Amino acid sequence: SLPPEIAYMLQYTGASVVLAEDQEQVDKLYEIRSEIPHVRYVIYEDEKGMRGYKDPWLLSFAEVLERGREHRRKHPDAVERLLLEASPEEVCHLSSTSGTTGRPKAAMLRHRNLIHMGVALQEVDPLLPTDDYLSFLPLAWIGEQMMSVAMALTGGFAVNFPEEVETALQDLKEIGPHVMFSPPRVWEGIQSQVWVRISESPRFNRFVYERLLKVGYRAAEYRMRGRPMPLGLRLAYWLADQVLFKPLRDQLGFLRLRRAYTGGAALGPDV
């Protein structure tokens, strides 16, 4: 985001603490510091390039953790006391709109809202405590809050995070999640990668892929309509799965995937 956009959101929300990823984001906040006098602290995560910054306004994430540990030693019951004092009606998340038709606005979500959302989703499509979920989207997006916070609290599954943004695809293969949630552009990007690899493969491989893909589409139609597949199609799909779909899922990290959610925009029928 540009500094004026950041200034607007901080003024709009009245935030007193800001979490910045790295030096680049910290510098943006310095540009608008005079416009955000209510911000008491800026907490930065990546310490690269921050050695020369000597300002009590700034705190490294490591410093925050150490302060928390020290506070815990002095006040061992502080967290439990705060939990008992908390109310389901308290605001826990400000969800920003996209701002495509004007300046962004913030929807005020309470603890009750998020937990109810998680419970409702569990009733419709239950997830298991033994499931692994891969979280690689911004937590500022309400869709990721829904999965990584609300659904994780109500379903009890493990939330995994990539080591770095650049290693997300490799981490996906290593984790092999049971559940994923992504906007259409992510699924479309994965589909494009598959298409590129197929288009660069030998002609015979492309022929096999196209033939077996048709079998997969036919099987998917029966599954989506909840109808049993004819015997011939079941056999053809089993063969297609062994030859193409299962190895492909393994390469993508989808071998254990049971739930692939999407939201935020329309998903193309081909995907």
Residues of each region from the PLM?
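Helix N-cap/beta->alpha junction signal
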Residues: 21-22, 46, 90, 183, ...
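Conserved ATP-dependent adenylate/AMP-binding module captured primarily in the ANL superfamily
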Residues: 1-31, 117-134, 165-179, 251-253
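Conserved pre-ATP/AMP-binding loop-to-beta segment of ANL
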Residues: 58-59, 63, 69-96, 103, ...
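Conserved AMP-binding
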Residues: 137-141, 264-266
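Structural core segment of the AMP-binding/adenylate-forming
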Residues: 1-67
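Conserved AMP-binding/adenylation subdomain of ANL enzymes
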Residues: 115-132, 139-242, 256
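Adenylate-forming
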Residues: 23-38, 187-201, 242-255, 269
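Extended, hydrophobic alpha-helical segments in both membrane/secreted and soluble proteins
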Residues: 6, 90-121, 129-136, 145, ...
